[in-house]
């Protein structure tokens, strides 16, 4: 099977699998929910937009940012609801409304400059050794700063040296920031951060579910599980795209 055919089948698997899982999970949760049915349906729709965005992103398509805009706005609202109910999510809510939403427009403009259009793929690039060092140091410093700030104000954080609710809020938050920045500027290394986002987000929503969180927690566990699978394929595709771009220099 050639690479293009594999990518088409893999994208179809992610889209169909996510859609089926969402329909079944939402139907079960909807039937058993006494309240919050509107939020449940909104979460399901946002998750579907998110999987369309991440599949498009993995394949280097600029339509990523249309689906992404709907996804991040809805997810920010869901995180805010989870935090209001006593769980984690404050940092992610702030991130999505003040950073992720406007970055969809930034990414659209940047990808157009790097050759992506309705049918073509973006010209990907890679970090060099020095850039890797700076990105790594900035990531560590940002993680510490965000932890200290959110631990100070997050009402869900219990007392103690290490507040796990805050850790699960901060790690996907910082990975999201760096992943989006590298994505908008078309760097292959974005996928290492997206893999981190997906792992930590699954952990966060699983913890919310185990402590009696919102009925939409299961939807987000499914969503980020599919995202995680897609992230590894995205890394593979973007590695090849960056090699192709280097060869054309």
Stretch-by-stretch model annotation:
Residues 1-17, 129-135:
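N-terminal membrane topogenic signal
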Residues 53-66, 181-193:
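Membrane-helix interface "capping/anchor" motifs
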Residues 70-123:
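Hydrophobic, ordered structural segments
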Residues 26-46, 90-101, 159-172:
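Structural signature of hydrophobic alpha-helical transmembrane segments
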Residues 146-189:
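A mid-sequence, solvent-exposed acidic-amphipathic segment
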Residues 95-111, 124-151, 171-175:
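Alpha-helical transmembrane segments of multi-pass integral membrane proteins
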Residues 47-55, 74-77, 98-110, 175-178, ...:
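Alpha-helical transmembrane segments and their membrane-interface exit regions
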Residues 179-249:
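C-terminal transmembrane-bundle signature of multipass membrane proteins
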């Amino acid at each position: 099977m050639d690479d293009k055919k594999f990518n088409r089948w893999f994208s179809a698997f992610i889209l169909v699998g996510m859609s089926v899982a969402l329909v079944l999970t939402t139907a079960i949760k909807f039937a058993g929910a006494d309240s919050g049915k509107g939020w449940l349906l909104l979460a399901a729709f946002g998750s579907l937009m998110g999987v369309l965005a991440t599949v498009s992103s993995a394949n280097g398509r600029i339509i990523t940012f249309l689906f992404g805009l709907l996804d991040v706005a809805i997810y920010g609202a869901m995180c805010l609801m989870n935090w209001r109910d006593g769980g984690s999510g404050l940092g992610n809510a702030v991130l999505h409304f003040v950073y992720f939403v406007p970055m969809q427009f930034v990414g659209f403009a940047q990808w157009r400059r790097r050759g992506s259009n309705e049918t073509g793929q973006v010209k990907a690039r890679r970090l060099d050794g020095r850039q890797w060092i700076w990105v790594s140091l900035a990531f560590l410093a940002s993680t510490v700063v965000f932890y200290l700030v959110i631990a100070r104000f997050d009402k869900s954080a219990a007392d103690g040296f290490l507040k796990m609710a805050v850790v699960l809020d901060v790690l996907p938050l910082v990975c999201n920031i760096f992943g989006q920045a590298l994505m908008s500027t078309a760097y292959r290394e974005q996928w290492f951060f997206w893999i981190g986002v997906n792992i930590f987000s699954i952990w966060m929503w699983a913890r919310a579910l185990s402590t009696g969180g919102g009925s939409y927690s299961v939807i987000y566990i499914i969503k980020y599980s599919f995202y995680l699978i897609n992230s590894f394929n995205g890394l593979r595709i973007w590695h090849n795209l960056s090699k192709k771009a280097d060869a054309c220099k």
